[in-house]
A protein has these predicted regions:
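Conserved beta-strand-loop-alpha-helix hinge in the C-terminal portion
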Residues: 177-179
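Short glycine-rich loop/turn motifs that provide flexible caps or phosphate-binding loops at active sites
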Residues: 19, 147, 155, 165-167
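Short secondary-structure boundary/capping segments
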Residues: 14-15, 61, 131, 138, ...
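Terminal amphipathic alpha-helical/low-complexity segments used for targeting or macromolecular assembly
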Residues: 1-68
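Flexible, glycine/small-residue-enriched loop-and-beta-strand segment within the central core
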Residues: 52, 75-85, 90-159
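C-terminal/domain-terminus segments
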Residues: 159-174
Length: 179
């Protein structure tokens, strides 16, 4: 069994999370990031696109999101600053992005309602799973993709450009371009 109290030199749990290393998810810095995102997502959940604070709140959750991209509330993420969204992308309501690992969504994408993006991977070994640890693996969605309602994208998956994923699909492996 792994010793989770033996921290590597000069590496925070947050840095481990971002670099696909096993990290402790109840670390104070990680939890502060989650709490911040949760507060902002809760605030966004009662807004409409016409709300005066809508754009400011979306940009606080996902820094750098283009003006041309839209998120329909409610929306939930773990951190927000692990998400990159391209130009003219539409993310429908009830989207969940667990972004301990980076989530990149290309330009001109359509993300259906209730889509879920999960970057965390819990340990396979049951004894390790009893500890508050996991790894996170990036998800990448290419340009011009369409994910139907209720799609689940699992840790480490890349969906190639111009692909269409049918509603209700669970994507566990990479999808080539034009699929």
């Amino acid at each position: 069994m792994t010793d989770y109290n033996n921290e590597s030199e000069m590496t925070t749990e947050y840095e481990k999370m971002r670099s696909q290393q096993l990290y402790c998810f109840d670390d104070a810095e990680v939890m502060a990031s989650i709490v911040r995102a949760n507060e902002l997502c809760t605030k966004l959940s009662i807004m409409t696109l016409a709300s005066p604070e809508y754009r400011q709140t979306v940009e606080a959750i996902i820094p750098g999101i283009p003006q041309s991209s839209v998120i329909i509330p409610p929306f939930h993420c773990d951190h927000g600053h692990g998400i990159t969204v391209g130009e003219h992308t539409f993310i429908n309501c009830d989207c969940i992005m667990l972004d301990g690992g980076e989530i990149t969504i290309g330009a001109h994408c359509k993300i259906g309602p209730r889509c879920q993006f999960f970057t965390p991977q819990h340990p396979i070994d049951y004894e390790e799973r009893m500890q508050p640890v996991e790894t996170c693996h990036p998800i990448r969605i290419g340009d011009n993709c369409w994910l139907g309602g209720g799609v689940t994208v699992c840790p480490g998956v890349t969906i190639g450009p111009r692909s269409i994923i049918a509603a209700g699909s669970v994507v566990i492996r990479d999808i080539p371009a034009d699929s």
